[in-house]
């Protein structure tokens, strides 16, 4: 039994090391370091565009208006017409410097279907640009065309009611007026690659396809996209809905920019469990969603807020978020619909660390009892830590009682006392938003130190092994954890067979056997772990098949 216990400890340590490899440790909070007065430390330099409304792009020379069923390479200036899907496990390669202009009349969009790939590798000096086909003279605006949709076979927690019954969950991506096979996403392969999306700008997308709520597309929509996909250096500007939205899967990303978009900047749903580091949000006081609730972060597990697994449990770090009030000096128009810097609801469990939020109406809202339990009672499940919410935000905390949130904030180094002047960006609030900003920190900035990467959520929170490679399993979730009497073990399996589940105490003794040779099917499986007979403390749950053994940490706290 001692050997099993030591193996459990070794597995947890290995998981931590694997997860840490993604993160770039910083001393500073926010997306940018202290300036060295050279472009080298400003990762938005060269490839971002702060004035796309007035950028004259060349006229299109070729047109794509039908699905792409064979591997294809694009270059030059392309007119994108209709919904164009890359199908049949094909690869769409887009060369650096290519400009693809979306058609307004047909509400065009580009869809990368499950099994297909996009290889869009731009460079800092030759980014790939997706933009509106409208001219500067005619005027461009949010929602001129559809956007980019990447779909994969990663695990999601929500299946559509009209889908064919599968041994896994799949769904149609939201936004389209009718469902068709090319917009299905979800499966069992969280390590899948949908290609590369690097040094890319997306401008003026997010069209509403109908008058029905949630019928808008986004800048970059990711449905069930796996961690083998490379996404970095992506700017979404003037998007008519969300800049970036993740529906399940576990794709990672670095260096994301949301600039003057309409609805939410980073929206996570349906069990997404990836990681994002280095992100910039810049809002415009005159651009918000008329339907209400324009937020920086908006995160759901599932509506209503019930315990569907896997949980939405992604981790963000090093985000700089500039709200519509900027340094607090900007008066918002009476028709504005801005809300929160962070809106966590419907049983979500995302974590945000080492980040700065300035100029919002509200700061952090933890909404609903199940969501609150994830943060206030289960720090290994979800956490907000080492944040600065500037003192110009009138309501730093909403959703729970202020005293509860103050206690939470104090324990997790969430600072609500710093002014924008103390945060001290190099040029964070230019008079005109079209002016190139500089969100690096001056040497005297209070955000120049204090970041930390020791929180357990950086290693997957121990309770989530979705980011490790396993022979039998794609995803393992144990929820709730800590357990107050009963928890559910969610297992997304790669194999058919049998599974045994044991609970082991810290001495190595088996104290509970929730499953003995239980049938295991490819896809979603559930095991109830009844902890009522266990004393408060730390345990290890082992999952054993004919191919492998995995271990998850369990905390019991009645």
What spans do the regions from the language model cover?
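Sec-dependent N-terminal signal peptides
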Residues: 4-13
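C-terminal outer-membrane/trafficking sorting elements
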Residues: 471-479, 483-558
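N-terminal signal peptide c-region/cleavage motif recognized by signal peptidases
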Residues: 14-18
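Extracellular beta-rich repeat passengers
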Residues: 20-75, 80-87, 91-93, 105-115, ...
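Primarily the HKD phosphodiesterase
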Residues: 99-101
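Residue-level detector of conserved, well-ordered beta-strand and adjacent loop positions
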Residues: 75, 131, 267, 466, ...
């Amino acid at each position: 039994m001692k050997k099993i216990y030591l193996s459990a400890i070794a597995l947890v340590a290995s998981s931590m090391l694997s997860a840490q490899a993604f993160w770039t440790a910083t001393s500073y909070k926010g997306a940018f370091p202290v300036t060295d007065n050279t472009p080298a430390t400003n990762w938005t330099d060269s490839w971002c565009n702060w004035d796309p409304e007035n950028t004259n792009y060349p006229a299109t020379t070729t047109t794509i208006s039908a699905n792409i069923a064979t591997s294809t390479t694009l270059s030059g200036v392309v007119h994108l017409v209709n919904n164009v899907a890359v199908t049949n496990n094909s690869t769409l390669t887009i060369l650096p410097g290519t400009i693809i202009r979306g058609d307004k009349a047909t509400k065009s969009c580009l869809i990368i279907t499950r099994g297909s790939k996009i290889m869009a590798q731009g460079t800092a000096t030759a980014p790939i640009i997706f933009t509106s086909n409208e001219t500067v003279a005619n005027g461009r605006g949010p929602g001129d065309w559809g956007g980019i949709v990447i779909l994969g076979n990663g695990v999601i927690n929500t299946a559509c009611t009209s889908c064919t019954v599968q041994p896994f969950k799949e769904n149609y991506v939201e936004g389209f007026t009718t469902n068709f096979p090319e917009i299905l996403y979800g499966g069992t392969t969280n390590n899948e690659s949908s290609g590369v999306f690097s040094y890319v700008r997306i401008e003026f997308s997010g069209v509403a396809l109908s008058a029905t709520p949630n019928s808008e597309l986004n800048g970059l929509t990711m449905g069930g996209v796996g961690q083998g996909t490379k996404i970095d250096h992506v700017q979404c500007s003037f998007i008519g809905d969300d800049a970036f939205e993740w529906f399940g899967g576990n794709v990672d990303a670095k260096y994301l920019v949301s600039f003057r978009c309409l609805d939410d900047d980073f929206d996570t749903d349906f069990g997404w469990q990836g990681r994002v580091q280095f992100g910039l949000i810049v809002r415009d006081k005159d651009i918000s969603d008329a339907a209400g609730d324009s937020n920086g972060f908006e995160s759901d597990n599932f509506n209503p807020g019930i315990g569907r697994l896997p949980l939405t449990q992604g981790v963000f770090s090093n985000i700089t978020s500039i709200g519509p009030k900027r340094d607090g000096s900007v008066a918002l128009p009476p028709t504005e619909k801005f809300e929160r810097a962070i809106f966590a609801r419907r049983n979500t469990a995302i974590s945000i660390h080492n980040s700065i939020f300035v100029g919002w109406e509200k700061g952090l809202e933890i909404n609903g009892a199940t969501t609150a339990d994830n943060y206030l009672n289960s720090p290994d499940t979800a956490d907000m830590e080492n944040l600065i919410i500037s003192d110009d935000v009138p309501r730093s905390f909403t959703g729970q009682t202020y005293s509860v949130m103050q206690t939470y904030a104090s324990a997790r180094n969430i600072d609500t006392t710093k002014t924008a002047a103390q945060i001290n960006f190099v040029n964070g609030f230019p008079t005109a938003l079209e002016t190139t900003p500089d969100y690096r920190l001056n040497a005297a900035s209070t955000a120049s130190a204090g970041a930390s990467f020791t929180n357990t959520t950086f290693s997957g929170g121990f309770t989530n092994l979705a980011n490790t490679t396993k022979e039998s399993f794609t995803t393992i979730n144990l929820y709730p954890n800590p357990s107050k009497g009963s928890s559910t073990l969610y297992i997304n399996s790669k194999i058919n067979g049998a599974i045994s589940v044991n609970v082991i105490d810290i001495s190595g003794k088996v104290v509970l056997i929730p499953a003995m040779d239980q049938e295991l099917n490819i896809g979603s499986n559930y095991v109830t772990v009844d902890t009522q007979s266990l004393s408060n403390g730390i345990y290890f749950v082992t999952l054993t098949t004919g191919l492998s053994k995995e271990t998850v940490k369990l905390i019991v706290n009645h």
